[in-house]
């Protein structure tokens, strides 16, 4: 992803890396990536690398740096982060113990923060979405606000990860945000809270169309999504709009489970790892909506596991895609726990069932529809009966005749 598209959910809400460089999917670093569920402990093989230079730098700093209180822990973490940064991969990164715990908290749907997602656009930190009922919404923050300062510190030059690390914090503490909105400068004092957020929300339109929004592909997504179909696909309700807009991704397995609700057999995605080895993931064949008409909504912030889902559904001819081109994150990361911290490392690229790579290219919808304003996007949790300004959702319903 381009550096100018970093998204992170403040664990604060916090979701970062979604992490990575550019849609920092939650402290997750700059964009929540597609994570595999396994956590592997790794013993490094013997290497011909000479580590004496690192040792000499460390010792010289400790002995001669003008400020004698340089922390050995800080230097070690900096060295680890620098080693990973040298890969030039925006989705690989070293996480401190606190950062790793924050990432895991987000995917569990429980975390402390303000309840907002941010995106890095060029040199600006922009609020992408505000979660209903959270401190961010209560304070009056709005999607599209540009964060110019946090606790008096300018955000100029910040990445999404930087924003996450400054805004998130313990429940009960306060953070001050300065934002620019329509040429005006506004200030907000926001008290962080513990937030429990479901990954799925639903609404039924005209007693015919089930609208399902997936906010992220976390540990509870498959169960919540299956329950949503079970509870609502009955009687005259037989068509579906699947909304993946602003969804930064998450677990590959969760995406596979969602795909399996619509595709009865075949491949969901292909993971290509080191050396070109391919792992073909298959659908489970136990879905509830194999024959239901389906439209999928995408936008420029749909990434990672969202794109895996949309790509598979498209390749299998199960749905029409509506919206604008997706983010374009075609890699998979895995967490390798360390003695102190975690290594979030790219271990594969993924392809759609038809062997298409969307990395840096994104997925182009069948029907391109833009929103005049980000705030026009339908908010199922806030105004379930008002979607009049959401031209993308309106187009999806029109395609279904709903």
Label for each model-derived stretch:
Residues 2-91:
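Terminal targeting/pro-maturation regions of precursor/exported proteins
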Residues 62-126, 174-176, 180-189, 197-202, ...:
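Extended, small/polar residue-biased N-terminal targeting/export presequences
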Residues 108-150:
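Glycine-rich active-site/cofactor-binding loop and its immediate structural neighborhood
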Residues 113, 117-131, 208-213, 288, ...:
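PDZ/PDZ-like groove recognition
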Residues 128, 137-143, 151-154, 159-336:
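Cleft-lining beta-strand/loop regions that shape enzyme active-site pockets
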Residues 339-349:
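Short acidic, Pro/Gly- and aromatic-enriched capping/linker segments at domain boundaries
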Residues 358, 368-402:
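Conserved functional hotspot residues or short segments at active or partner-binding sites
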